[in-house]
Regions:
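Conserved catalytic or regulatory cores that recognize and/or transform ribose-phosphate-containing ligands
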Residues: 45, 49, 99, 140, ...
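Hydrophobic, well-structured mid-protein blocks that either form specific transmembrane helices
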Residues: 75-111
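Active-site-adjacent structural segments surrounding the nucleophilic cysteine of cysteine proteases
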Residues: 1-87
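Solvent-exposed loop/turn segments at secondary-structure junctions
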Residues: 38, 138-141, 173-175
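Active-site-adjacent substructure of cysteine-protease-like catalytic cores
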Residues: 112-167, 197
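Noncatalytic regulatory segments and standalone regulatory/sensor domains
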Residues: 20, 145, 155-198
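Residues that form generic nucleotide/phosphate-binding pockets
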Residues: 70, 74, 91, 95, ...
Length: 198
């Protein structure tokens, strides 16, 4: 069984691309803000919100970067990174409040939970048509080295036999990962997921 959310492209990029930001701090540490920007565009396209102040008919990097700078104060890049789920919820929640959007609620799903429970939560979100922000801190598997201390979105899954593959979106591209391998980091300090209600 496979399900992927409809998504969007920005001048050929699959979603926003942090590495192309003109602003140095956003380029280096703006991953949380970028996932929030992507969620806003997604919600406008598919959930009838009104969060992205530019045209949705033809998404451009220039306007996306401008939007990213509007999001930056809420999910500000910092020395330690946005390394807790609650910081993300507080920052993005403040943005939503300031933009008169009370339809979207968020709750944290700790990376300390069992992978089986995390898979269930992920599948439920995707089945509801909702992207899932994911925070990965350190990981023992070097497959995920470009995703360490990083926020990205999960936008699809594929289930077969005992395996669950997940579609991760970041850096303007998408990747398929084994969810158990992604979730079981081998480190005591964990990230986790953000679950939306809308």
């Amino acid at each position: 069984m496979r399900k992927e959310l409809d998504y969007f492209k920005i001048e050929g990029d699959y979603g926003g691309n942090q590495e192309l930001f003109p602003d140095l701090m956003m380029k280096l540490g703006g991953c949380a803000a970028v996932t929030a920007c992507d969620c806003c565009i997604y919600f406008d396209l598919y959930k009838e919100t009104n969060l992205y102040p530019y045209s949705l008919d033809r998404l451009t990097r220039k306007e996306y970067f401008q939007f990213g700078m509007k999001m930056k104060p809420y999910l500000r890049p910092r020395w330690t990174g946005i390394d807790k789920l609650e910081i993300y919820i507080d920052g993005f929640g403040e943005f939503l409040c300031d933009h008169n959007c009370n339809r979207i609620k968020m709750r944290p799903f700790s990376g300390e939970a069992e992978a089986t429970n995390a898979k269930t939560a992920l599948v439920e979100q995707i089945d509801k048509g909702l992207p899932v922000p994911c925070l990965l801190l350190n990981h023992k598997n070097k497959t995920f080295k470009d995703f360490e201390w990083h926020w990205f979105l999960l936008t699809g899954y594929e289930l077969f036999e005992e395996k669950c593959m997940v579609k991760a979106v970041s850096y303007g591209e998408w990747y398929w990962f084994d969810f158990d391998e992604l979730w079981n980091t081998g480190h005591s300090r964990k990230g986790g997921l953000i679950l939306f209600e809308i």
